[in-house]
From Swiss-Prot:
KW Protein biosynthesis (keyword) present: yes
Any one GO biological process: alanyl-tRNA aminoacylation
The name this protein goes by in its record: Alanine--tRNA ligase
UniProt GO molecular function: alanine-tRNA ligase activity; aminoacyl-tRNA deacylase activity; ATP binding; tRNA binding; zinc ion binding
Length: 930
């Protein structure tokens, strides 16, 4: 498009287009969900329409369209670092509730993309669900290039998010060109689903056929529905042709306001620099985070949310405190930040007029939070300076500062990133500038005083992260809830060896807002018992579930003092009453096997692969085992098989296990491995040491098998890179989980392998790379190797299919071309039926380059649509002063058509075939040629 569309114009074009297709516009709803406990925030365009799709409410129309404001915070750390991550964004959508389905949805999609937004079909790529041939054919029919359409499996093209309608989907991608393809990989990026900034998904169209109850139980919908989503910010980025979403008009003018008050400037060219300056990267991140987070907070407060220590309030507090940190670094005062707020509201008030009405409330709320932030920073730096006056700061000091005194974790992460990259003078200075930008004291802090082992800090922080991620609603509570922090000493104990308790006394009750109560009736709550059999999430092991009396226990975490807090659904309790508890024995038994297997796998990695392997973290649940470790290369399949074999060998020994209580020195003397030594040193009593076998002795507080034979079976199921030198290995144990994996995942992999060769045989093409895998003994190789081979075969077969299609197309094109060129007249009319449009076009291109003095008028009727093409050789048209657009206008007027094109080739559609009128056109051309 000649003029770049603004974000507001793009939104209006979308809504106006669908209103022209008889859709009713639904206003953008509040970010705070109404009557939907499954969501903390509205996080998608369809989230506010779920009751319409389920049939619980009648929609205002069967066809709906909207631009829904959304908020997601699951990857907040990526904001400002990647091109497209946001906390706040708008999702454009069109919806059909029991009205149109695939055909119309794809027709609308093609028309909007190709004709309204005028995106070049050559730059559009499509994915469809592998079993959805109808969508594939519809895209081809509506102008998509066949070779640009990729069939994908369920993981990529089956849409579901939480509870509600779901089904197969088709996605539209846009190719932004080589300047966004730094490695020059081309289409490989799209076809192999490699993360990139070149091929960007802009629209997802979901064919809703099922309802997910939130527990992956699917039922057929009584009526077929369509729901779609297109990110407004992404569309703006593409239509405005800028490097990132943060370079679109909605961000640029806010950035200018920040620059007005800061001594730092945003670097517009940084994206394209191959070697990025660390200070520029940090400065750009500051700008983007401030704008993104402020926008999210402005909308959320205007919708009724307020900062606090829990749930939505905690999210707002975190977003604001991150913003304040980066404002400090850019030296922008709170007073000047008011203009940032005003500008964001001005950008959005046309479509969201309610923002202007809430301006004063927003500013006052943010000011209160800023005052609390300053108080927190003052307290944390006071403690930091006390520590620095006594000694150098180590990892445990820093951990305590963050978790107890509220020192910003973002500062720690920035220091870690800079100081582990390179300790050159520039990075050291930047690190000092960052920490001192929020330092309220005139006395500057020197980086030389911070002797921090960041790896050790990460280990200390692992458990904190695990609990926070396990229950996002209590993340803020664990750090800041005074009621829990100030719990009195309680006589409460956990017994590893029992699976039920009788007559346990209720010591404490908290309601769902973490307020202590004496009694609770039929409400979600947290309780502490004097004795419990429920294991609490700790050390990477998932908590037990079960029942207290008749009430479900769905989570168990530890209080800051170590008491087990049981989350109970709709419980009825009062302090002092006696209750019975029973864990889910099946799940506990599985987790025992999983945890013991993780120890054996770790030991086997060190012995089979290398003693230099260093564990970074682990997680054990009833579904899988994950173990993160550092190593300088990827494991070979032979090594993975060796690890499996070694773990199975120890299982087969049926070695009795032991739990020993030892001091730290005693544990180390017997060869026990431990990863939290700084924590263990603070424990005055004895430590729990698990002895599985001579090869595996670890300090551990988890639940384990009593005999290695109890594990039954073991299998490695995954190996992925987490970054340079960091790996994650996944596994399962027990007959139950291994058999489940074999019957579901491995069986499918074997079926896929066989199907690829079946397809290869059908193609009747010989390929050396495919032939190489033909004799693979899939029973003797590891599943992960089979998975890799399948990926190679999948890509290779797809390439061969495209090659075959091109060969067939070329052959058919030549056959039709020959029919065209047999004619020796200067003009000729051809009436055809059911010829593929692309095939016809290719044939005519060949024909006009062979029969260089002939004008062709071709009529082709396909599925009731009458297509015309009028063309000749380009030089012939030019030499004879022919402009076929003039004849196309005449043809359109007489036969109810529309179309046009270049001077030597025009195409379009007509409503009827009238040979007399068509020949008149050719007669006119003939007359001009004489």
């Amino acid at each position: 498009m000649s003029k770049k569309l603004t974000t507001n114009e793009i939104r209006k074009l979308w809504l106006d287009f669908f209103k022209s297709k008889n859709h009713t516009e639904v206003e953008s709803k509040s970010l705070i969900p109404k009557n939907d406990d499954s969501l903390l925030w509205i996080n998608s365009g369809v989230a506010t329409l779920k009751t319409f799709f389920s049939g619980k409410e009648n929609p205002p129309s069967k066809r709906l369209t909207n631009s829904q404001r959304c908020l997601r915070t699951n990857d907040i750390e990526n904001v400002g670092l990647t091109s497209r991550h946001h906390t706040f964004f708008e999702m454009l959508g069109n919806f059909s509730i029991g009205d149109y389905f695939r055909k119309e949805a794809i027709e609308f999609g093609a028309e909007l993309v190709f004709k309204v937004f005028k995106l070049d079909p050559k730059k559009i790529y499509i994915t469809v669900y592998e079993e959805d041939q109808e969508s594939f054919d519809l895209w081809v029919k509506n102008g998509a290039i066949k070779s640009h359409i990729l069939k994908c499996d369920k993981s990529r093209n089956f849409w579901e998010i939480g509870s509600g309608p779901c089904g197969p989907c088709t996605e539209i991608y846009y190719d932004r060109g080589e300047k966004y393809d730094f490695q020059k990989l081309g289409e490989k990026l799209f076809f192999e689903d490699i993360e990139n900034d070149r091929y960007i998904e802009i629209w997802n169209i979901v064919f809703s056929e099922f309802n997910n109850d939130g527990k992956n139980n699917y039922t057929k919908l009584a009526r077929q529905n369509i729901d779609t989503g297109a990110g407004l910010e992404r569309l703006a980025c593409i239509l405005q042709d800028v490097p990132t979403n943060y370079d679109t008009d909605a961000f640029v003018n806010v950035r200018s306001v920040i620059e007005k008050y800061s001594n730092k400037k945003y670097d517009n060219n940084l994206y394209f620099e191959s070697k990025k300056d660390s200070e520029k990267v940090f400065i750009n991140k500051c700008f983007s985070v401030i704008i993104d987070h402020f926008k999210a907070v402005i909308f959320a407060i205007s919708d009724g949310a307020l900062p606090s220590n829990k749930d939505r309030g905690y999210i707002l507090r975190k977003l604001l405190r991150r913003s304040f940190l980066y404002l400090n670094y850019l030296k922008v005062s709170f007073e000047n930040s008011k203009e940032i707020i005003n500008t964001i509201i001005s950008n959005n008030e046309t479509y969201y007029p309610y923002l202007k009405e809430n301006l004063n409330n927003v500013i006052n709320t943010i000011k209160l939070e800023y005052d609390l932030y300053c108080e927190s920073i003052n307290n944390s730096f006071k403690k930091l300076n006390e520590l620095l006056n006594k000694k150098l700061l180590d990892a445990s000091d820093l951990f305590n500062l963050v978790t107890t005194y509220g020192f910003p974790i973002e500062i720690v992460q920035s220091l870690q990133e800079l100081l582990t990259q390179s300790k050159d003078a520039k990075n050291l200075k930047l690190a000092e500038d960052i920490i001192n930008s929020i330092n309220p004291s005139d006395k500057k802090i020197s980086i030389s005083k911070l002797k921090i082992e960041f790896d050790e800090f990460e280990k200390l922080f692992d458990e904190h992260r695990l609990i926070a991620n396990a229950n996002a609603s209590v993340k803020g509570m664990e750090n800041q809830n005074e009621e829990l922090l100030n719990l009195p000493t309680l006589d409460s104990s956990f017994d590893y060896e029992i699976e039920s308790v009788k007559n346990s006394k209720v010591l404490k009750i908290f309601d769902e807002n973490w307020k202590p109560v004496e009694e609770i009736k039929n409400k979600d709550c947290w309780v502490i018992l004097d004795k419990t059999c429920f294991f609490a999430t700790t050390g990477g092991q998932e908590h037990d579930t079960g029942k207290i009396n008749k009430f479900d226990v769905v989570d168990v975490i530890k209080s800051p003092q170590g008491y087990h807090l049981h989350k109970v659904v709709k419980g009825t309790f009062k302090i002092g009453e006696k209750v019975d508890g029973q864990i889910n024995s099946f799940d506990r038994n599985i987790i025992r096997k999983q945890h013991s297997s993780e120890h054996l796998m770790h030991s086997a990695l060190k012995r089979v692969v290398s003693p230099t392997i260093k564990q970074e973290g682990a997680f054990k649940s009833i579904e899988k085992i994950t173990l993160d470790f550092s190593f300088n290369r990827k494991l070979t399949y032979k090594e993975i098989l060796g690890v499996e074999k070694e773990v199975k060998r120890i299982i087969a020994t049926k070695n009795p296990t032991q739990v020993l209580m030892k001091t730290l020195d005693e544990a180390k003397e017997m060869g026990a491995i431990g990863y939290f030594e700084q924590v263990y040193k603070k424990i005055s009593g004895k430590l729990r040491v698990l002895y599985l076998c001579p090869e595996s002795i670890e300090i551990c507080g988890g639940t384990h098998v009593y005999n290695t034979g109890d594990i039954e079976d073991f299998m490695v199921t995954g190996l992925t890179s987490k970054g340079s030198g960091s790996w994650r290995i996944e596994a399962v144990s027990s007959n139950y989980l291994v058999d489940k994996f074999k019957n579901n995942v491995i069986k499918k992999a074997i079926d896929d392998f066989n199907n690829y060769f079946k397809k290869y045989k059908e193609l009747n093409i010989k390929d050396d790379e495919v032939e190489k895998y033909k004799k693979t003994d899939i029973n003797s190789i590891h599943y992960l190797e089979l998975k890799e081979i399948n990926e190679i075969l999948k890509n290779k077969i797809n390439t061969l299919v495209i090659r075959k299609e091109k060969e067939n197309l070329s052959k058919e094109s030549n056959e039709i071309k020959n029919k065209f060129t047999e004619v020796k007249e200067s003009t000729k009319l051809f009436l055809l039926k059911d010829i593929d449009r692309k095939l016809l076009f290719n044939s005519l291109v060949l024909a006009i380059n062979e029969a260089k003095s002939t004008v062709f008028l071709v009529i082709n009727e396909v599925d009731g649509v009458i297509q015309y093409v009028l063309c000749s050789n380009e030089s012939f048209a030019k030499n004879n002063n022919l402009d076929f657009n003039l004849y196309a206008k005449d043809l359109n007027a007489k036969l109810g058509g529309k179309g046009g094109g270049r001077s030597y080739l025009v195409q379009g559609t007509i409503l009827k075939i009238d040979e007399k009128e068509l020949n008149k056109i050719l007669d006119t051309i003939n007359a001009k040629l004489k």
